[in-house]
Curated annotation (Swiss-Prot):
GO molecular function: RNA binding
PANTHER family: RNA-BINDING PROTEIN HFQ
InterPro entries listed in its UniProt record: Hfq, LSM_dom_sf, Sm
A GO cellular component annotation in the UniProt record: cytosol
Protein family according to the UniProt entry: Belongs to the Hfq family.
Protein name as catalogued: RNA-binding protein Hfq
PROSITE patterns per the UniProt record, alphabetical: SM
Domain spans labelled Sm: 10-69
Its biological purpose: RNA chaperone that binds small regulatory RNA (sRNAs) and mRNAs to facilitate mRNA translational regulation in response to envelope stress, environmental stress and changes in metabolite concentrations. Also binds with high specificity to tRNAs.
Keyword annotations of the record: RNA-binding, Stress response
Species this chain originates from: Ralstonia pickettii (strain 12J)
Length: 79
C-alpha cells in the first residue's frame, strides 16, 4: 500500500487504539467483529475482546467506532 493510503488509516486507527474506543469491524464476507484495537500495521489489525484476533486488512470492509473520535491528518502538499 502506498504511503498516501496510510494518511487516513494510521491516524484513525491510532486514535481508536489510544482512546480505547470499542469498534465494530465488518468483514467483506459480512461477519461482524467487535472489540478494541490493540495494535495494527500495514497488513493486520489486532482486535481484542475475550481473546486477541489478528484480522487482515484486506478482509475488512468497514470500521465503525462506538463513539465519535477526533484525529489529525498531517497531509503533505501534492507536488
Amino acid at each position: 500500500m502506498s504511503n498516501k493510503g496510510q494518511l487516513l488509516q494510521d491516524p484513525f486507527l491510532n486514535a481508536l487504539r489510544k482512546e480505547h474506543v470499542p469498534v465494530s469491524i465488518y468483514l467483506v464476507n459480512g461477519i461482524k467483529l467487535q472489540g478494541n484495537i490493540e495494535s495494527f500495521d500495514q497488513y493486520v489489525v489486532l482486535l481484542r475482546n475475550t481473546v486477541t484476533q489478528m484480522v487482515y486488512k484486506h478482509a475488512i470492509s468497514t470500521v465503525v467506532p462506538a463513539r465519535a473520535v477526533n484525529f489529525r491528518v498531517d497531509e503533505a502538499p501534492d507536488a
